[in-house]
Structure formats: C-alpha cells, structure tokens
C-alpha cells in the first residue's frame, strides 16, 4: 500500500477496509393518526434502504492523530453488476451525498476520485484514491495532494435488520442485479433495543463473498 499526503510517502497504514453498507432506515413523511398532521419519522424496509461504499484507512502517525481518511458515497443500484469482479476498473460515483474527509476533525478531501482495480481474492481488491485538501495549518492556506493506492480488505455487505428474513428482500431491492448465490450470510450479535423505542431486536447481518 502506498499513501501520499502532502507529497510525503506514509508507510504506517495499519489497515485499509472497503465495505458495502446497506442503510435499512430513512426519514420519510408520515401522517399522525391523532391529529392528521404530517411529519417525518424513521421508516424501515426495502423502500427506505440505500447502499453505500465506505473506505476507511487506519494510520498511526506520531504527530497526526487526526489523520484517518474516510470515504463514503452512495451506490447506483440500477447499474450494480451481478458479480463483484465485474466492478474492476469502475470509478465510484461522487454525488452531493459523498463524504470524504482527512480525519474525524480534519478537512474535507475535495476532487475525490476512487477507482476499483482487480480483485485479488473474494476478500481483497486493489483501489486507487486521489484527492486534495486544504492545509489548515499553513500560512497562507495551501491545497495539498492526497493519494492512496494498494490492496484493501473487503469486509463484505453489512446491514442492520430487525428480522433475519429481511436481509434477502432488502438486498434484492437495493442491488437488484446482484447474484446473491455468490454470498454466504453471517449473522452478528442481537441488540435489544428496549421498550422505549418499541422495536424488535436488531440483528447485524453480513454477507461475504464466498470463495
């Protein structure tokens, strides 16, 4: 892996992980029964689900604790292919919902371009990420280059569902062309949400590409 920040080569990238996150809730207008007024509330299910790519880099820099590059962008489900291997050579879309940052409290990474390369295995893929950012500490303020290139771990498709059987229809709705037979389902821990939110226990479901 090669990470360049401000023309420096950083050799302390401890981990680089790419995930496909399915958000299974979204705020939507609802009409209250008691007063008939319309408001918004979180709604759950296929119609309220969206897929996102998320790339995270974990870096250990002695004097730069806030350096934790993170990229988050929506997926165009209508063009998502049947097999992940077909994504090789794809440039991930950038929209007004895309978020790319230098770190938790750091500047935005602008002019972001993230491309997927070859899949080395079902759990590893080559990526190339270029961007630029504003150096808040330079005087006068400068725009500096950022780039990352190398193999990253693919952690799978992750979603939170209220019932185990919800995972398949949600995935089919969000990524309709994806061949789900190439994946195996791994269930995570249950979270008891309690009576205050009046919701069923939530299960974290992860689908990993089978070898």
Indicate residue ranges for each PLM-predicted region:
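Acidic, glycine-rich flexible loop segments
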Residues: 83-153
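Residues in flexible loops and secondary-structure boundaries
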Residues: 124, 156, 160-162
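Intrinsically disordered, low-complexity terminal/linker regions enriched in Pro/Ser/Gly
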Residues: 160-211
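An ectodomain-focused feature that recognizes extracytoplasmic/extracellular
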Residues: 1-104, 189-209
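Short beta-strand-to-coil "C-cap" segments at the C-terminal boundary of structured domains/repeats
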Residues: 23, 151-158
């Amino acid at each position: 892996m090669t990470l360049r920040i401000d023309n420096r080569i950083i050799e302390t990238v401890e981990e680089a992980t790419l995930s496909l996150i399915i958000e299974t809730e979204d705020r939507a207008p609802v009409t209250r029964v008691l007063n008939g007024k319309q408001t918004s509330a979180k709604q759950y299910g296929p119609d309220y689900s969206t897929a996102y790519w998320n790339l995270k880099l974990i870096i250990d820099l002695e004097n730069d604790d806030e350096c934790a590059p993170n990229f988050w962008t929506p997926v165009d489900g209508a063009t998502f292919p049947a097999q992940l291997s077909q994504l090789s050579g794809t440039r991930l879309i950038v929209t007004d919902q895309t978020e790319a940052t230098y770190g938790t409290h750091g500047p935005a990474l602008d002019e972001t371009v993230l491309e997927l390369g070859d899949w080395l295995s079902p759990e590893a893929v080559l990526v190339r990420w270029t961007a630029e950012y504003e150096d808040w500490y330079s005087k006068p303020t400068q725009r500096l280059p950022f780039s990352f290139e190398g193999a990253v771990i693919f952690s799978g498709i992750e979603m939170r569902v209220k019932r185990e059987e919800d995972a398949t229809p949600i995935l089919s709705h969000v990524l309709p062309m994806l061949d789900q037979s190439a994946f195996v389902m791994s269930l995570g821990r249950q979270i008891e949400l309690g009576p205050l939110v009046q919701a069923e226990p939530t299960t974290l479901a992860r689908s990993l590409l089978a070898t």
